[in-house]
């Protein structure tokens, strides 16, 4: 089974990806792991990516696409199938993935899209607070400190609601054309992500069993 998982930051995509890998035994291909492995193994694309990263530059699409292609061409993929997590990030990368899969004789079986209302995501992502003395991390709603005094805690700039909302807006603008592309191919299953983790996975599992 060859899959792609999508969802905005805070939707619980990483948690569900780990559960899919455990339950279905597919190879988990996350962008970060893929880059680290390619650079550690000094593949052609890995060396190229490292040259950009060492200069503090963004890795261009053609290198990212090349690293994905190298990984998808490995033996375990034909045997186990894959779950792509964190790629494609743009519609151009989605088209490149289509071409790569065709070239390697693989096909995408499904796209799992974990949907959570953006306002819920802002609450999830902007609730993080840090104790000034201990550095411990808490969440205002989901994991509040026992003796909360506002002056004892601070919030990172990245976690402030307005920053989180801007980040989500950027992600939504990138994800929409990708989802539209895969909807036209009838590959997308939307999963309600604003429920308990076990309930989300029950819906994911049901969708994937129907694909098999």
UniProtKB/Swiss-Prot annotation:
SUPFAM superfamilies: P-loop containing nucleoside triphosphate hydrolases (SSF52540). Disulfide bonds: none annotated. It catalyses: AMP + ATP = 2 ADP. PROSITE patterns: ADENYLATE_KINASE (PS00113). It comes from the Bacteria. Residues 127-159 are annotated as: LID. It is found in: Cytoplasm. Pathway: Purine metabolism; AMP biosynthesis via salvage pathway; AMP from ADP: step 1/1. Its main location: cytoplasm. Catalyzes the reversible transfer of the terminal phosphate group between ATP and AMP. Plays an important role in cellular energy homeostasis and in adenine nucleotide metabolism. Monomer. This is Adenylate kinase. It comes from Streptococcus pyogenes serotype M6 (strain ATCC BAA-946 / MGAS10394). The lineage of its organism: Bacteria, Bacillati, Bacillota, Bacilli, Lactobacillales.
């Amino acid at each position: 089974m060859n899959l792609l998982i999508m969802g905005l930051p805070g939707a619980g995509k990483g948690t569900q990806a780990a559960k899919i890998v455990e339950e279905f035994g597919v190879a988990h291909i996350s962008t970060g792991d893929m880059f680290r492995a390619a650079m550690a193994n000094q593949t052609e694309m890995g060396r190229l990516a490292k040259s950009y990263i060492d200069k503090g530059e963004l890795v261009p699409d053609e290198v990212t696409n090349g690293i994905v292609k190298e990984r998808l061409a490995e033996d375990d993929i034909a045997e186990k199938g894959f779950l792509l997590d964190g790629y494609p990030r743009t519609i151009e990368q989605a088209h490149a993935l289509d071409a790569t899969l065709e070239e390697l004789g693989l096909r995408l079986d499904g796209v799992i899209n974990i949907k959570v209302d953006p306002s819920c995501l802002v609450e999830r992502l902007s609730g993080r607070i840090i104790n000034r003395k201990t550095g411990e991390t808490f969440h205002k709603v989901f994991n509040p400190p026992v003796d909360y005094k506002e002056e004892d805690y601070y919030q990172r700039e990245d976690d402030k609601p307005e920053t989180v909302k801007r980040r989500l807006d950027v992600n939504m603008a990138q994800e929409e054309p990708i989802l539209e592309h895969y909807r036209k191919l009838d590959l997308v299953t939307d999963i309600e992500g604003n429920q308990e983790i076990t309930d989300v996975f029950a819906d994911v599992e049901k969708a994937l069993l129907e694909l098999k």
